[in-house]
């Protein structure tokens, strides 16, 4: 996860204990580990690579908040990411934004995710991204790309923390606090058992 604000409810729900603090905070119990990588692609890529190299997980789940680029996605609802688009990383030959396909579990509402290093606060900017993706974050693509490089399965679940009507930092932080407990409970009850069916899985 990117921030302690998002991770706190997971740490509480799963009763995780701090395992290490550097180079990234890592918490664990007897089934899962959670790493707080920081905001943005570079931080997420470094944290994911470190985590895979150190623990060799069977799979990784990138979870946390994402903004809705339109009114189709409901504030507080959770979506499973089926495709990731990077508007700020065009293919060098075609100029088309790079796309990635993460691993997917059946039975969950799906969404396309846009990942870029700059937050989406401008209304026009959000409208442009909505033509490609329904949700937007700053980490998902980097996590999935590193997992792909290391041949580690990657799943992404995001809850909606802001919509075109909720664009101030104060509103986003308020909504993350408001919905993070519901998100962590949903993940632990509905998602984690699916990931743990055959073997332990790393968060």
Range-by-range predicted roles:
Residues 1-19:
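N-terminal beta1-alpha1 ligand-phosphate binding loop
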Residues 23-203:
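Glycine-rich phosphate- or other oxyanion-binding loops that anchor nucleotides, phosphorylated ligands
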């Amino acid at each position: 996860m990117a921030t302690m604000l998002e991770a706190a409810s997971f740490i509480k729900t799963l009763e995780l204990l701090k395992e290490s603090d550097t180079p990234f905070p890592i918490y664990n119990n007897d089934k899962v580990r959670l790493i707080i990588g920081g905001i943005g692609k570079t931080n997420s890529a470094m944290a994911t690579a470190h985590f895979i190299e150190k623990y060799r997980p069977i799979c990784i789940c990138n979870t946390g908040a994402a903004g809705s680029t339109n009114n189709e996605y409901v504030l507080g609802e959770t979506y499973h990411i089926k495709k990731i688009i990077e508007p700020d990383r065009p293919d060098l030959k075609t100029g088309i934004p790079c796309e990635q396909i993460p691993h997917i579990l059946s039975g969950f509402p799906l969404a396309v995710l846009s990942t870029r290093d700059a937050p989406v606060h401008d209304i026009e900017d959000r409208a442009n991204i909505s033509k490609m993706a329904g949700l937007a974050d700053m980490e998902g693509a980097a996590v999935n790309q590193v997992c792909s490089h290391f041949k580690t399965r990657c799943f992404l679940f995001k809850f909606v923390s802001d919509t075109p009507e909720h664009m101030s930092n104060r509103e986003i932080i308020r909504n993350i606090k408001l919905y993070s407990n519901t998100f962590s409970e949903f993940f632990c009850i509905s998602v984690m058992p699916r990931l743990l069916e055959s073997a332990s899985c790393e968060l």
